[in-house]
Amino acid sequence: MISKKLSWLVVGLVVLSLLVTGCQQLQPTPEAAEAPAAAGERLCDGVKIVFFPGGPPGGPFGTVVYNGAVAASADLGADMEVYWSDWNPEKMVSQFKEAVATNPDGIAIMGHPGDDAYETAVDEAEANGIIVTSQNTTLPRLEERYKGDGFGYVGQELYESGYMLGKEAVKRFGLQSGDRAMVWGLLSQPTRGLRTKGAIDALEEAGLTVDYIEIDSATDADATAGTPVFTGYVTSNPDVKLVVTDHGGLTATLETYLKAADKGPDDIYGIGFDLSPATLEAIRGGWTDLVLDQQPWLQGYLPIVQICLVKKYQFSGLHIDTGSGFAHADNVELLAPLVEQQIR
């Protein structure tokens, strides 16, 4: 019931946003505008959409994104097919090409591979009349090129989110110049890495010594695979005061990492991104101290809405920032019921 109410609230907010901002970019007027859906008919009935939740099936972040897409498809009547990608950029591009070959009405992609990797395939899709939009990680060049054809974005502003988390950690925990921090992130990915860079910049501006570790492909797909990396780092750097996990799956695994390194909940500050049932329990237990919530359920729901609105009414692409605020021990119980339902 909560999911249903949230779903219609989100649709209402999106439509209101369109009414307010629609004059900013006019679309060619269709020869005959479609009438609103008749009673019992849903907005997206018969519209075929391919959706990318990003990670492996059952992963803590991708599951919430998927839940949002499923809710939108049920509410609007879309016929949705899902491609799971294990957070592998090369796999995302390959699967996108496969999806284009099936000629759906629209495809909602994760932007991790970047503009260069996607460009040729997106150009082909757009030339064939397939609506393409993005979530979680921006594709600035492609979004600019095809915004008038419905290419939008739903997600956080990446650099700003990372910077905000790092800055808040310094302030909240009283970290000082010379303190050691470990950032475990994805700098190698062209746009996705901006969030990692934002966190590093904020910490270095405060004078912290930052050790960076790239998340390898095995850990990207299965966060528990990174346990030896974490324990090895902590053993070699016993003075580390802060660990930043720039990945929802790794953030959900912080308690496991710390216990494997024989650390208690008060020994190292642990911060990261995104809520999940495991992260909720880690916050309650003191293992995870600060999380930036980017509301991933919306990153599933709103791209489906985007494609439906473009298909039915030729609206242009919307750019929606889902980055919300911080979750920690003092406020997480307000969100706990929704986290447990994998909505927040």
Where would I find each of the regions flagged by the language model?
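Short, solvent-exposed amphipathic alpha-helices that sit
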Residues: 60-75, 161-165, 190-210, 225, ...
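Extracytoplasmic "Venus flytrap"
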Residues: 39-72, 76, 81-98, 111-116, ...
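Hydrophobic alpha-helical segments within soluble ligand-binding/sensing domains
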Residues: 43-44, 92, 152-179, 226-227, ...
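Hydrophobic alpha-helical
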Residues: 107-127, 199, 217-281
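Short, low-complexity disordered leader/linker segments with a strong preference
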Residues: 1-48, 74, 123-130, 343-344
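Flexible loop/hinge segments that line or gate small-molecule binding clefts
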Residues: 115-116, 121-160, 276-284, 289, ...
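Hinge/cleft segment of the Venus flytrap/periplasmic-binding protein
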Residues: 30-47, 183-184, 202-206, 295-344
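Short beta-strand elements in bilobed, periplasmic/extracellular small-molecule ligand-binding domains
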Residues: 73-86, 180-182, 203-223
